[in-house]
From Swiss-Prot:
GO terms for cellular component: extracellular region; extracellular space; protein-containing complex; secretory granule. InterPro entries: C_natriurtcpep, Natr_peptide, Natr_peptide_CS. This is C-type natriuretic peptide. The keyword 4Fe-4S does not apply. It comes from Mus musculus. GO terms for molecular function: hormone receptor binding; neuropeptide hormone activity; signaling receptor binding. Residues 24-73 form a propeptide. The gene is Nppc.
Length: 126
């Protein structure tokens, strides 16, 4: 079962990688950026000598806040996508609950029918 899921995921990824332009036709290609940690450190260093309440036109305080919120939003999207892939690729943590065969009360009678509770507990079904 796991092998078939793995093969299905691999085929899906192969199909998606072959046609990236058809998946999002209206988006321009992304320009490589600096890693998020460095970008946040640069923005804090640039605005570190200004007060939070300073709203002068040349200060760029609103720009700094917008850059920081955009950066945090990008990080959240990345975390959500990683969680989705983890759920897809790993089996359910309570997989034992969903597997059959070892559930209580599934014993069969002499003719393949389920026995009543007393008969199955005592073994006097047949």
């Amino acid at each position: 079962m796991h092998l078939s899921q793995l093969i299905a995921c691999a085929l899906l990824l192969a199909l998606l990688s072959l046609r990236p332009s058809e998946a999002k036709p209206g988006t321009p290609p992304k320009v490589p950026r600096t890693p998020p940690g460095e970008e946040l450190a640069d923005s804090q260093a640039a605005g570190g000598n200004q007060k939070k309440g300073d709203k002068t036109p040349g200060s760029g305080g609103a720009n700094l806040k917008g850059d920081r919120s955009r950066l945090l939003r990008d990080l959240r999207v990345d975390t959500k996508s990683r969680a989705a892939w983890a759920r897809l690729l790993h089996e359910h943590p309570n997989a034992r609950k969903y597997k059959g065969g070892n559930k209580k009360g599934l014993s069969k009678g002499c003719f393949g029918l389920k026995l009543d509770r007393i008969g199955s507990m005592s073994g006097l079904g047949c």
